[in-house]
């Protein structure tokens, strides 16, 4: 009998990249692999693990928000509110995140027009660091092939993801184009290769 797969406790696995590129699909597929106990925590940022952050995220998706800075501060509020839950989970389990702080930089700063709102990049990045500096990732799977058009997936967004990948090359794995089965198999193989998955 094949043992159930087990993600290394304490590890943080990130699914990052362009909108509509398959991240949430892969999060859902990975969550159904029949993990050994304690099974990993699977979640999405910024909706996260609490009722408060799910409510805030719903607000940012549905409400008409005039200020780009206000939208990003609401997202960062969700991130900060989820830190205790993520920290607790990593004490004995792995965590798989659908979006990390890279999305906040790329879609918040570069696509969110925060410079036009008078927010220096160094200030915005410092706010992100305050929230995320104690949650380093073991691996970031970067999705750069959207399966359908999204107006936010501009060339600048693609470039900035590539910049972050180069800046963090030691932990970044670019996901090749492929169907859902092939992509799941690729992620599993990469987790094994990095000694993050056994069984």
Located regions from the model:
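Walker A/P-loop
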Residues: 24
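NTP-dependent small-molecule kinase module
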Residues: 2-7, 31, 147-199
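Hydrophobic anchor at the beta1->P-loop junction of P-loop NTPases
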Residues: 15
